[in-house]
A protein has these predicted regions:
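C-terminal ends of transmembrane helices
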Residues: 165-172, 329-330, 390
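Helix-loop interface residues and adjacent transmembrane-helix termini in multi-pass membrane transporters
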Residues: 48, 57-58, 168-169, 247-248, ...
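Extracellular loop-to-transmembrane helix junctions
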Residues: 54-90
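Membrane-interfacial loop- and helix-cap regions that link adjacent transmembrane helices
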Residues: 3-8, 27-29, 33, 79, ...
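Membrane-interface "cap" regions at the ends of multi-pass membrane proteins
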Residues: 1-50, 74-79, 93
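Residue-level recognition of membrane-helix boundary sites in multi-pass small-molecule transporters
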Residues: 62-63, 174, 253-256
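Central hydrophobic cores of alpha-helical transmembrane segments in multi-pass inner-membrane proteins
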Residues: 46, 71-80, 159-168, 383
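Short, hydrophobic transmembrane alpha-helix segments
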Residues: 51-59, 172-173, 365
């Protein structure tokens, strides 16, 4: 194994020292099950709670179809990325942009992948800031309904304070316990969401018709729902970084972990989406827990579990950003790797995502907008494009056809989903007061 890792290694001692300091490449001791809970934490999160809302905007036929097709497409594209991680002997593509550079060239690959990956990871951290704050607020209101109202801003600040500490853990393997807890919480609160909805039961007058007041509303709601579903399958942006933590050869253990992760994802997503929509119909909230008021202790517990999960999710998505920033500072700016460099960089990043989350907490609209604009390319069709370039399947073969079909579907998703999300943000902004 050591020989495999060292094969064709032409790095200088200084380059090795830097790589041993950077968060993505500093530790390669992970087991296959690490990839399971890292991927579950990356994928299952805020998105699962919005799936019944997405169903209400699409109806049974389109909703069920989109959820299942998205599960299949994203499992396929994730498999492609796992396959390509070590396709060049003696080299590992430890970061998404490194794979892009191999396919498109040094400069073009960087320009294509990095902006999209940064948008995905930073926007996800912002959304998790909002989700964590809202979950704490809902917990507070459930346990103390007669207490004085506290602004959402303060709950987001509490969530951020956790990350001012956790963000200084050095690498992926150092946050494994946090990620494992988050993965367990995701399955737990998903189960609570659909079982509590089932226990609540239907009032017998559930409407499964379009939730909009007119055709225009229904069209925009449909577009936003596409973004909700895209956001629910978002782990691709960190999959190579997760695989980088596994010793070489990493393909088999990584894929084993991914398969288990996707089974857990299905157990989380499908019951929440289908049962939540069945119980509430088109009256469902954009976060299903907001519509469940009793028993209050159970809803409070579910919201605490959401809080724990998005704490782990934030760290999973922040780590590649930390790696990018620290790589740039030590390799391009030539700053010396140090505790204070890492401390300053990560503290500023957490503060920035906290500020944006406090200022623009439009949860439903944010999911739709970022889901279509940024997550669709990096999750649905960029792996297919890279696969066609590097693997060169025969024209009109099954592999060639299926990749082009997924590319077209991904482009449609990228085009349509942000329209609905942006409209929801605008509508929310009309009545929103800053830092309320």
């Amino acid at each position: 194994m050591a020989a495999r890792e060292g094969e064709c290694d032409q790095r200088t001692e200084e380059e090795r020292a830097i790589d041993d300091w950077l968060p993505i490449t500093s530790s390669r001791t992970a087991k296959w099950w690490y990839s399971t809970f890292h991927n579950v934490t990356a994928m299952v999160g805020a998105g699962v709670l919005s799936l019944p809302y997405a169903m209400s905007s699409m109806g049974w036929g389109a909703g069920v179809t989109m959820l299942i097709i998205s599960w299949i497409i994203t499992l396929y594209t994730l498999w492609q990325m796992v396959e390509m991680h070590e396709m060049v002997p003696g080299k590992r593509f430890d970061r998404y942009h490194e794979l892009g550079q191999h396919a498109f060239g040094e400069k073009l690959g960087l320009y294509i992948v990095v902006p999209q990956q940064v948008v995905v990871e930073v926007s996800t951290c912002i959304i998790y800031m909002v989700t964590g704050g809202k979950s704490l607020k809902k917990t507070y209101e459930s346990l103390c309904s007669d207490c004085r109202e506290i602004k959402l801003t303060y709950f987001i600040l509490i969530f951020a304070s956790v990350h001012f500490f956790l963000s200084h853990l050095p690498n992926f393997n150092s946050i494994s316990v946090v990620s494992l807890a988050a993965a367990v919480m995701s399955l737990t609160y998903s189960t609570i969401a659909w079982t509590a909805a089932l226990a609540k039961g239907s009032d017998g007058h559930v409407d499964y018709g379009p939730r909009g007041k007119n055709t225009k509303d229904n069209v925009f709601n449909f577009f936003n729902a596409l973004g909700d579903i895209a956001f629910a399958y978002a782990g691709h942006n960190v999959v190579l970084e997760i695989q980088a933590t596994i010793p070489s050869p990493s393909k088999k253990p990584m894929w084993k972990g991914v398969v288990f992760a996707y089974i857990i994802v299905a157990l989380c997503y499908l019951p929440v989406a289908f049962i939540g929509y069945y119980i509430f119909g088109n009256e469902v909230e954009d976060n299903i827990l907001l519509g469940l008021n009793k028993p209050e202790w159970l809803i409070a517990a579910a919201n605490i579990f959401v809080f724990v999960h998005v704490v782990g999710g934030y760290q999973i998505y922040a780590m590649p950003v930390f790696d990018m920033l620290e790589t740039y500072l030590v390799k391009e700016i030539k700053l010396k790797p140090s505790f204070w460099l890492r401390f300053t960089t990560r503290t500023i990043y957490v503060a920035l995502t906290m500020f944006i989350g406090m200022t623009f907490p439009f949860f439903g609209g944010l999911v739709g907008f970022f889901g279509g604009f940024a997550l669709a390319p990096t999750t649905y069709f960029l792996p297919c494009i890279i696969w066609l370039i590097v693997k060169k399947p025969k024209k009109f073969s099954f592999s060639w056809i299926i990749n082009w079909v997924f590319i077209i579907l991904g482009l449609m998703l990228m085009t349509l989903a942000p329209i609905g999300g942006l409209r929801n943000i605008i509508l929310s902004a009309k009545t929103y007061k800053f830092y309320q």
